[in-house]
A protein has these predicted regions:
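Multi-pass alpha-helical transmembrane bundles in non-GPCR membrane proteins
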Residues: 3-228
Length: 228
C-alpha cells in the first residue's frame, strides 16, 4: 500500500494541466494539423506545377517540421496523464519544436537566400545542426534543462538577425514584416510558456504558436510568388 501511495504521489507531481486544459492544448494544435495539410496541399501543388525543385525541397522540409510539431503536441496533450507513454511523448513534443523552427527556415534559405553568397546555405546548415542537437537534448532528462530549451528555441528563431541584410535583399518588404510579426508571436508565446503552471497559460502559448504559423505561411507564400 505504501508503495502504491508513493507511485501515486510521484505521478501526481508530473500532472501540470487539468483535463480541461489538456483538451484546449490538444484541440488547439489539432487545428494546426488541419491548417498544415490544407496549406501544404496548396504549396506543393504550386511547386509541382512550376517544376521548381528547390522550392519543392524547401516546402517539404517546412511542412515536415510544422506538421510533426503539431502532431506531436496534439498527441502528447491528448494522452492521459497516467499513461506510460506520456513522458515519452513529451520528449517527442519538445524535439519536434526544433524541427518546426528548422523547417520554417528552409523555404527562406533554400529559395529566397540561396543565391545570397554563403548566407543561405550557412544558415540552413546551422539551423538543422541545431535541430539535430536539440533533438538529442530533448531525449535527455527534460526537467534538468527545460529553461535551456526555451533559450535554444528563442535563439534559433532569432538567428536570422545575423543574416538580416541578405534577408531583406532577398524578399519583399511585406515578407519581412510577416516574419517580424511571426517572431513577435513566438516570443510572446514563449513568455506564456515560461509561466505555464498558471492555469490555461500553456493554451495561450499554443494560440500564439498558431498565430506565428499563420504569419509564416503568408511569408512563405509571398516568397513562392516572387521566386517561382
Amino acid at each position: 500500500r505504501m508503495c502504491n501511495e508513493k507511485i501515486y504521489r510521484d505521478m501526481k507531481l508530473k500532472i501540470h494541466f487539468s483535463h480541461k486544459e489538456e483538451l484546449w492544448n490538444s484541440w488547439s494544435h489539432a487545428g494546426g494539423i488541419l491548417m498544415g495539410f490544407v496549406v501544404g496541399a496548396i504549396f506543393l501543388y504550386w511547386c509541382f506545377t512550376m517544376h521548381n525543385g528547390w522550392a519543392t525541397a524547401g516546402v517539404i522540409l517546412y511542412l515536415f517540421g510544422m506538421l510533426m510539431s503539431y502532431i506531436a503536441s496534439t498527441v502528447y496533450h491528448a494522452v492521459s496523464a497516467w499513461s506510460k507513454w506520456k513522458e515519452r511523448l513529451r520528449k517527442w513534443d519538445h524535439a519536434a519544436i526544433y524541427w518546426h523552427i528548422a523547417g520554417s527556415y528552409s523555404p527562406i534559405t533554400l529559395i529566397a537566400m540561396r543565391d545570397q553568397g554563403y548566407w543561405g546555405w550557412s544558415l540552413f546548415i546551422f539551423i538543422w545542426a541545431c535541430a539535430i542537437a536539440g533533438t538529442i537534448m530533448s531525449f535527455a532528462r527534460l526537467k534538468d534543462h527545460s529553461n535551456l530549451e526555451t533559450i535554444c528555441f528563442v535563439g534559433m528563431g532569432l538567428s536570422v538577425l545575423v543574416a538580416f541584410k541578405p534577408l531583406i535583399d532577398s524578399v519583399s518588404t511585406a515578407t519581412v514584416w510577416w516574419i517580424i510579426a511571426e517572431g513577435v508571436c513566438y516570443i510572446t508565446g514563449a513568455v506564456f510558456y515560461s509561466i505555464n503552471k498558471k492555469k490555461y497559460m500553456h493554451s495561450v502559448f499554443h494560440f500564439f504558436v498558431l498565430a506565428g504559423s499563420i504569419c509564416h505561411i503568408i511569408a512563405v507564400w509571398d516568397i513562392l510568388m516572387k521566386y517561382i
